[in-house]
UniProtKB/Swiss-Prot annotation:
The SOCS box domain mediates the interaction with the Elongin BC complex, an adapter module in different E3 ubiquitin-protein ligase complexes. It comes from Mus musculus (Mouse). This is Ankyrin repeat and SOCS box protein 15. InterPro entries: Ankyrin_rpt (IPR002110), Ankyrin_rpt-contain_sf (IPR036770), SOCS_box (IPR001496), SOCS_box-like_dom_sf (IPR036036). Residues 524-579 form the SOCS box domain. Belongs to the ankyrin SOCS box (ASB) family. One of its GO terms (biological process) is intracellular signal transduction.
């Protein structure tokens, strides 16, 4: 224990010394800032041209003009920066020997040092030359990247080896404490990780989010690197700052071999992150089917219940129908509700997986859930209202065919006497007809207390239909349709809307307010002719049969097909002549 403490103290002391040196270099850069804003001399232009063209003899002549080496172009590039990205080593040696050492660490306007430029260019010999001359190997560019990190990003083993040979800091943190070991794990470079570990690289380093290299390898699905890190002491049980386990990271990566390996070494599928999400939720959301197959049997029902949401919710939110089907096959409940604290974190207070599918406009997931028995009437804001508002005709058709309540109200904000759905379909005749054909209570649109032109009020009897399970029968009678539709910015719609509505009624009681608006619209003559003449017996029979059958049977194609009626009559009962979407 004491030996390890001494080793850690030595490591920290060494790093402090390196940091002081780097800060000293950066401070000197701030003080000594050569003639960047001065117009470039002819000698500087000739010097740079000789570097770019590889003309060594001319270069040896021009480097005698020391002031030319101290001039930078508009990008902040000195001749030394130009030299480090040229493949001819002698050019770099010539310029480097002629330049003041203070220039060796100067950065371009993009924040790159000569060493980071050489590493990015992939010029190993130039990197070795710079290091041989004494260039400091740990100076970061302005992006916070060390030369070692850049070399690993490029995947250059030789360059990494060269930097290590010249005592570069292996554990030096970069932006968000991302280290060389993390980057090697991300790139899946087992050889580079082995090299780092052989030179006392730290397998337990954490980045700015508390993730270890083991977690990074798991997230990016590098199974060979993952196993190697485990054998070298990587902690399978390590948790990131957000509580995410290594297995949780692997679930996000989706590699089933990584998940199998972590489970073999003791990883648990029942460890949630701070948000309460389990690895199974992550895999379902990301759509990792094979990973999900591994996680289903190792995740307890109690852990899922405690989390407050099911993998069904996650798969629906992530729009992954195949994962949904797998979860349904394994007995997960499609009607499970979000816990209250999760539901209340959404403005709409959604509760079901079906709501996620509908709000994502995901037809496939919606169909999978409905076919598996999802109830479309469990959310405070009915799924049907979401689909109507989004103008998704096919999803509306699906929901209605599986029993969605066409006459639902959004109880949290409802202030109308008529069911809510029509409010979102006034500009879309196809959607409006779809609702009306499926049993929208159109008579409630004419239920008001204004009275007709003779002063008589309209009082409707209770509907003859029985409420379906899960449907609300509560109606807050406040704002009638005539008040809603005759506001100045919607007056122009009144004629067209009323003309459509009367196709679904027998008696049309127009109140004085609605009639006064209709009389100045072009549809009025046709509307007046219809309401002043009796309906056909055929239409009256249709309305009566529909009331007797009830919505539940009308909306199910199988029930309609069982009726002992000719096909033409069945079509007439369903208002197929007005089915613009079906046509």
């Amino acid at each position: 224990m004491d030996i390890n403490d001494d080793s850690n103290d030595d490591h920290l002391a060494s790093y402090d010394i390196q940091l002081c040196i780097q800060e000293s270099i950066e401070a000197s850069q701030a003080i000594f800032h050569p003639k960047r804003l001065v117009q470039l001399s002819d000698q500087n232009r000739k010097l740079v041209e000789a570097i770019r063209q590889g003309r060594i003899f001319e270069l040896q002549e021009y480097v005698q003009y020391k002031y030319a080496l101290e001039e930078a172009d508009e990008k902040g590039w000195f001749p030394l920066h130009e030299a480090v990205v040229q493949p001819i080593q002698q050019i770099l040696e010539t310029v480097l020997d002629a330049s003041y050492k203070t220039l060796w660490e100067f950065k371009t306007c993009d924040g790159e040092t000569p060493l980071t430029l050489a590493v990015k260019a992939g010029l190993v010999e130039n990197v070795k030359t710079l290091l041989d001359k004494g260039v400091w190997p740990n100076t970061k560019n302005d992006k916070g990247e060390t030369p070692l990190l850049i070399a690993i990003k490029r995947g250059s083993y030789d360059m990494v080896s060269a930097l290590i040979k010249y005592n570069t800091s292996l554990d030096q943190p970069c932006v968000k404490r991302w280290s060389a070991m993390h980057e090697a794990a991300k790139q899946g470079r087992k050889d580079i990780i082995t090299l780092l570990l052989n030179h006392r690289g730290n397998v337990h380093l954490r980045d700015g989010f508390g993730v270890t290299p083991l977690g990074v390898a798991a997230e990016y699905g590098h199974c060979d690197v993952l196993e190697h890190l485990i054998h070298k002491g990587g902690d399978v049980f390590a948790l990131a700052d957000d509580g995410a386990s290594v297995l949780f990271e692997a679930a996000g990566g989706g590699n089933p071999d990584c998940i199998s390996l972590l489970l073999k070494y003791g990883g648990s599928g029942n460890v949630p992150n701070r948000a309460g999400h389990l690895p199974i939720h992550r895999a379902a959301y990301e759509g990792h089917y094979l990973a999900l197959k591994y996680l289903i049997p190792v995740t307890s029902k109690h852990a899922i219940q405690k989390s407050g949401l099911t993998p069904i919710h996650s798969a629906a939110e992530g729009q992954n129908a195949q994962c949904l089907e797998l979860l349904i096959e394994n007995g997960f409940d499609v009607n499970a509700l979000l816990a209250d604290h999760i539901s209340q974190s959404y403005d709409d207070e959604r509760k079901t997986a079906l709501y996620f599918a509908v709000s994502n406009n995901d037809i496939h997931c919606t169909e999978v859930l409905l076919a598996a028995g999802a109830d479309p009437n469990l959310d405070p804001l009915n799924c049907l209202l979401v689909a109507v508002r989004a103008n998704r005709h096919e999803i509306v058709r699906l929901l209605l065919s599986y029993g969605a309540n066409v006459n639902c109200y959004f109880m949290h904000v409802n202030d109308t006497r008529f069911p809510s759905a029509i409010q979102y379909a006034l500009n879309d005749e196809i959607m409006l007809r779809l609702l009306l054909n499926n049993g929208y209570q159109v008579e409630l649109c004419f239920d008001c207390m204004h009275g007709n032109i003779f002063g008589n009020s309209f009082v409707w009897s209770e509907t003859e239909e029985e409420g379906l399970p899960g449907w609300t029968s509560c109606i807050i009678k406040d704002n009638p349709f005539c008040e809603f539709i005759t506001v100045p910015w919607m007056k122009h719609l009144v004629g067209g809307i009323v003309r459509i509505l009367i196709d679904y009624m027998d008696y049309v009681p127009l109140c004085a307010k609605l009639k006064s608006v209709l009389e100045v619209q072009r549809e009025w003559p046709e509307i007046r002719q219809i309401i002043e003449n009796p309906c056909s017996l055929k239409h009256l029979c249709r309305l009566k049969i529909r009331r007797v059958m009830g919505l539940q049977r009308l909306c199910q194609p199988a029930s309609i097909q069982m009726l002992p009626l000719p096909a033409a009559m069945r079509r007439y009962l369903l208002f197929k002549e007005f089915d613009l979407y079906g046509q």
